[in-house]
Amino acid sequence: MALEIQTKQINVNASSEFTFTNTIQEFLIGISRFRLSYGDSDHWVKTVSLSLNQQQPDSNTISVQVLGNLSDGSGNTIDTSDSFAIVVVVAWTGTADHTLLLANGDANTVFTLPSSSTTILSSILAGFDLAYDTDHYIAQINVSTINVNRNGNTATLSTTENMTDRDGNWASTATFNAGLIASSSSSPGFEVKATSNVYNNTNQSVTFNSAWTNFVPMMTGFNVEYSNNEGHWLKSIDVYLSYDAVNTVYGVSSMCDNDGNWQSNENSFVNGIVIGY
């Protein structure tokens, strides 16, 4: 039995298969990066969304389709050739481990934990849907770190989501998809370390208790906003979390239009976890 993790970059509206060495007992899917773009043009915004559709065609394979939406009310839509997600599939393979939970869900999902006492309890972001009633500028897009709300041996997930033009208009639709990693084992065979607000052009050190050889970052939330507290058209939004060989986490949360307006690096950040195994 072992933890296996695979990552792939998948364009919006495309699918890819993740084939593992052994039989998959349980799994979850998340992201370490996403980019949503109109292409060469900038436009108003009505909807910004990302979702991951998953299927398991056989005992060793997970198929993931990336769906994304960046659109206004005038027919301008996402450029799928310039829009993608880096998808992370975390799977426990081989013999089942009843001290472990890997699962995806949303605000309505009640997760059954392996125990009322856990050594690992971490959430990840797997998608979001933000929409105005009609076209507006974008000033800020925010999906706060997914919260784990625990009640004995069950848990639910929640977050706060915002999309605003800073002129009194806010998203009328705000939903999310997420995942949960939970273990009650004192030696699960991996560690999970969380980051806290990795701002643009900064980094954070992550220290593990064991000398793991593999490390994979996953996003748990983000905030991106234009400078000067202003709203503008949008050309693209690009958010990612990365991890290097010297225990350092880097994050970028960016957006821009075609008039030279960019995100505020002082106020834009990404949150996540790093799995060492």
Protein language model features and the residues they cover:
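Extracellular attachment/recognition segments
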Residues: 1-84, 92-277
